[in-house]
């Protein structure tokens, strides 16, 4: 959030990958002002610092949460609904600011809407409510695992290494037609919560 820190971070830098944000939906409901200050204020500071320091390309983390109450499946970038949390609103606002900085200041950007990132060393007790590490923790500790509803609700996912690769490709692309847009980053399929749990049990050789 500190302007001077953002300016110093971008000095002499050609490419920026902005992944920093507060990520808990429940916490955003309790602390909407703080989330706006960090997620939006910090993002705009980094955009301005990138312009001031002639950064070549800027990629950033958006979120599948911007789809809100839009029922269309599969999700397509052009169809978003009403945001359902302050966190989602900050991510949608970031996309709007990115478009403005592209149009007004000529900054080259790409945004990525991640779907449920998972991967090694993910903290099951962290603020990011990720179902896979919660399942793994429960199975390994042989503790109860709770599934809401009938477990047939579906989600899409993003392996963390794929998120890294899309950021690298986004920073380095020279395709002008690809710039100044947002993209879904996911497997491109739907997996039920029950399927995820059974797969985790199978992979961990648990009864």
Please provide the spans of the model-predicted regions.
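Conserved Rossmann-fold cofactor-binding substructure of NAD(P)-dependent oxidoreductases
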Residues: 1-15
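Hydrophobic alpha-helix immediately C-terminal to the catalytic Tyr-X-X-X-Lys motif of short-chain
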Residues: 93, 97, 101, 131, ...
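Adenine-nucleotide cofactor-binding loop residues
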Residues: 1-2, 41, 118, 158
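C-terminal substrate-binding subdomain of Rossmann-fold SDR/epimerase-dehydratase oxidoreductases
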Residues: 139-207
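Serine-hydrolase catalytic-loop signature spanning alpha/beta hydrolases and amidase-signature enzymes
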Residues: 24-28
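Conserved NAD(P)H cofactor-binding loop of Rossmann-fold oxidoreductase domains
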Residues: 19-23, 62-63
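Catalytic helix-loop patch of NAD(P)-dependent Rossmann-fold dehydrogenases
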Residues: 30-48, 52, 56-57, 66-111, ...
């Amino acid at each position: 959030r500190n302007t001077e820190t953002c300016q110093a971070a971008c000095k002499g830098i050609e490419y920026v990958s902005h992944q920093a944000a507060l990520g808990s939906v429940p916490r955003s409901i309790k602390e909407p002002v703080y989330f706006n200050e960090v997620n939006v204020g910090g993002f705009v500071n980094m955009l301005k610092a990138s312009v001031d320091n002639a950064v070549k390309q800027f990629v950033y983390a958006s979120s599948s949460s911007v789809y809100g109450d839009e029922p269309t499946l599969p999700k397509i970038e052009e169809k978003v609904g009403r945001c359902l949390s302050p966190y989602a609103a900050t991510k949608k606002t970031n996309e709007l600011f990115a478009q403005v900085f592209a149009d007004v200041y000529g900054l080259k950007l790409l945004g990525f809407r991640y779907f449920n990132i998972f991967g090694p060393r993910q903290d099951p007790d962290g603020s990011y409510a990720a179902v896979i590490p919660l399942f793994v923790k429960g199975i390994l500790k042989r503790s109860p695992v709770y599934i809401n509803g009938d477990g047939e609700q579906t989600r899409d996912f993003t392996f963390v290494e794929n998120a890294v690769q899309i950021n690298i490709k986004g920073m380095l692309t020279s395709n002008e037609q690809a710039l100044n847009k947002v993209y879904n980053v996911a497997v491109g399929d739907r997996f039920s919560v029950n399927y995820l749990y059974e797969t985790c049990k199978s992979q961990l050789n648990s009864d």
